[in-house]
Design a protein with these regions (language model features):
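Receiver (REC) domain active-site loop signature in two-component systems and cognate sites
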Residues: 61
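Active-site residues of response regulator receiver
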Residues: 58, 88
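Charged docking surfaces used in two-component/phosphorelay signaling
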Residues: 21-29
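Active-site beta3 strand of CheY-like receiver
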Residues: 50-56
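C-terminal output helix
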Residues: 113-122
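Conserved acidic carboxylate
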Residues: 14
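Short hydrophobic/Thr-rich beta-strand motif most characteristic of the beta2 strand and flanking loop
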Residues: 31-38, 46
Length: 135
């Protein structure tokens, strides 16, 4: 089934090509349109240009890491309201919830996570919207 222009657009930021392709496939099958980036700089450019409805980002991507990328999104008026779902293999990141909040990250999933879990969280986030930032 071809995605419709009315389907939500999700930016996938993942340096692991196989994961990026798997996320893309599952999102397309679940009624999302996708764009992807393999590093934070490329992701920021695509987010500014294409205004996705949500972002799924790994936190350990080359160049500008996922936290820096998310903070950069929060600083731009045109991207600051985009809900961000982070996926990471670093469970120790969960020890510092303020780091997520200050980066604008709304939800975090620990890898390995099921693509269905990503789809479920994205559906929730797109309808709920981003959490307000508390400084």
């Amino acid at each position: 089934m071809e995605p419709s222009p009315a389907d939500p657009l999700v930016l996938i930021v993942e340096d692991d090509r196989s994961l990026r392709l798997m996320y893309r496939e599952h999102l397309l099958m679940s009624g999302f349109r996708t764009i992807d980036a393999h590093n934070g700089h490329q992701a920021l450019e695509k987010a500014r240009d294409l205004h996705p409805d949500a972002v799924v980002t790994d936190l350990a991507v080359p160049g500008m890491d996922g936290f820096e990328f998310c903070r950069a999104l929060q600083q731009l008026p045109e991207t600051r309201t985009i809900p961000i779902l982070a996926v990471t293999g670093h469970s120790e990141y969960l020890d510092d919830p303020t780091r997520f909040r200050h980066s604008g990250i709304v939800q975090v999933l620990i890898k390995p996570c099921e693509p269905a879990e990503i789809v479920r969280e994205l559906r929730r986030l797109i309808h709920v919207g981003p959490a307000p930032l508390h400084g």
